[in-house]
């Protein structure tokens, strides 16, 4: 029986999946996971940085929720560490935080196209997030300070995902797998939004009777099976750990 991946392996796989699927270019993006001791595991940048697509478990290091981080020699924490710290501080229900730069999400928001529930069975989790509303943090800044991280956490509020205008997204979850899959779903919805906007009129949101027919397939399907399929795709492409 295959053992479950360790936290560092999960974060490394998540980074590889996000880069492989086009949500993270070169070195831009990171994932954190809350530790039992209150600190967090975080994808750091190393002395031989090769980008998110080739993230190794050795690129992941513990970082305190407060105070000065002290990664091993040659490693440094991302400039946007405050994103992770402030969301995890504000949201005790969140275990994992993803920050990436999905191009279709950024483009749709800049074009004034809100992510509405226009798809149904095509991607039910994306529809649910859009139905509840995906908030937007309106500043296109590098989130390098605690006060900016707090602004992002306030914009996110109790939602699973938020758009950072002209920048990217934050996606949260009760696991690395859930946060990564949510990020992928939002990018998929943004891609469909942009493509459908090329028609003569924007598609309407789903009618209530259709929404009522769409079940919650549960985390075993929405998160675990989808995650496993992306891990298998990495392995097939020779990019597995």
Regions found by a protein language model. Give the residues of each.
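Glycine-rich flexible loops
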Residues: 1-241
